[in-house]
Amino acid sequence: MKRFAAVTLAALMLLTVFASAASAADSVEIRGPVFNGSNIVEIVGDGITIDATQFAAFYYDIDDNVTTETLSIKDVSGNSGNVIGEGGIVYSTKIQKVDYEYYKPSLGWDNYSLLGFFAEKYIPLKSNSADKLAKLVIDSDDKITLRTGETLDIGQGYTLQAKQVDVDGEKVWLEFDRDGEYVDDEIIEVGADDSTWDVELDDIQDEDDVTVMRVHVNQVFQGAVDSIAQIEGIWLIDYANAMTIESDDEFGDLDDVSINGDTLNITNEDTFTLTRDSTNELAEGLSFKVADTSSNVLRFYLAKEFTDPGTYEVRGSVASGEASWDASNFAGFYYDLDDNVETESLSVSELNGNVIGEGGLVYTTSIKKVDYDYENEDAGWDQYPIIGFFAEEYIPLKANSADKLAKLVLDSDDKITLRTGETFDLGEGYSIQAKQVDVDGEKVWLEFDKDGEYVDDEIIEVGSNSDNTWDVELDDIEDEDDVVVLKVHVNQVFRGAVDSIAQIEGIWLIDYANAMTIESDDEFGDLDDVSIQGDTLKISNEDTFTLTRDSDEDIGEGMYFKVADTPTSELRYYPAIERIVGNETTSITKPDESGNETVSDNETMPDNTSSETPDLNETDTPEEPTTTPEEPTDNETEPDESNGSPGFGVVLGLAGLLGVVYLVRRNN
């Protein structure tokens, strides 16, 4: 028992050290086209306009070729240098009709009014007026099965419960709730011509008879044990958070509002400065990201940062025939704004109807040099080679050869403080630990680990005669030796109120454990003709590639073409990748037991052992990454140690409890 308790206690304490490692991506940035010139007057010319075909964050329906939003920079008298004059920025959006995902016109599921509003989907409470809006929560044609008593989490606190399922009478009794409170219920006859339930509510921003939810019940049937209702078609708006836009409202720096029927225009009453080396907030999450350049160069792009959990599509510009994309018109490709560096391109030629001929689909990428985020040439932090590879950042193991690559894990100039014994999670299972901090001797002993296993360690001298940088070099990485896999710059060591502390400023890391060698006979999806010429990698299709209508056609490594549901003569498509924020987990809650039921788009009849259903729409809040507490400096904030990773306190509690058990058993 003593040995068991001691080993268990040690294991639990080890868990507490790495409890901060579990985290999910907490945001995704989608950018628009890059504008580059000497000043705003040169860039704007007679005026520039960005719409959804250029900016993937704006709403776009590829099937119907529908856009609603534009952002323009006008040629106004106040434009000068890096300053946009009064009224020079115009955001405009207009209500449009779009098809339901569950498209059944004969059942009343044809189209509805939608308005993009600062790159989010909103529904006008009145179909021809843009002043009263509610966010669209879900528009889905997924097939979902509910047993009697089960509750479906739709998103944003809204749920749907199957109160009773009457198979013989072909009826289902559904209840609609918000935050656990009753909203409405209905008995739906499934054998009727229209088995749709429209939930209409009054007094939504002073509007009555507002349709807030639509549910179509496809069928009811008897399962192996339970009576089951199958839903196909759900549409819901967040009516509880609907809003009315007034002419005196302000949205960030856009504060001159004009509402004209189905159109909303908002401009800037004051000048707007594109401050270099910064993100200039415009309104509602829209911003201009501006490069760190000299005063005679101005370079920027429009961006939207999404933080709500979910899967986001990052798309390129829309094409209707032969086309090409690079980082300027496909936000998925790697781009360094400060250095104006891009590496990737994709081209389509030899297009006959909707078929790309052999060798007509070509992906190319080349190695380029970019600055470290921590810029310090004297300490060896100047530039490093990088290559975009299917919209991910990779590092070549040899600076001029594109055949051996490792993914870039981290390139950061954030200030991090480590006390003696503390471990900092770098990502992908890598970590560094401050073994000892010697303030008097101006030294720090760091250890580098992978998945908790020792890799290397070093005593770093922090004195003025040292570059304060630890380069971790490893051998036999894809048969290459002396590969720099980690760079760490220690800024200073100092004594805090209690502990000796090391401050790190500058970390760079590659995922060497998953490095790869690309061979000429490799295949990447439908790209299977590989050519490596020094620092350039070119991959094309040996066979024809069909742009099948109404589909996502995989190109390779997560990149795909989304093709509109149109005749071949009206071909419309774009390249895209997906980025995931948070942890997507919508659930069906069972009445008497835990567990969920799995239902795919191709419905399989569930049995009594089914356990999981995929979520319709994300509602859970993602876990925030937990970093090591830092000693406050001018640019640092001491984190609240009470807000650790979920479960951290539980682990400590279990460790303490087992410690008591161990001591009691030892004394006995």
UniProtKB/Swiss-Prot annotation:
Signal peptide: 1-24
Compositional bias ranges of the Polar residues kind: 596-611
Pfam families in the record: PGF-CTERM (PF18204), S-layer (PF07752)
Keyword Transmembrane listed: yes
Alphabetized UniProt keyword annotations: Cell membrane, Cell wall, Cell wall biogenesis/degradation, Glycoprotein, Membrane, S-layer, Secreted, Signal, Transmembrane, Transmembrane helix
Protein family per UniProt: Belongs to the Methanosarcinales S-layer protein family.
Name of this protein: Major S-layer protein
Species for this entry: Methanosarcina barkeri (strain Fusaro / DSM 804)
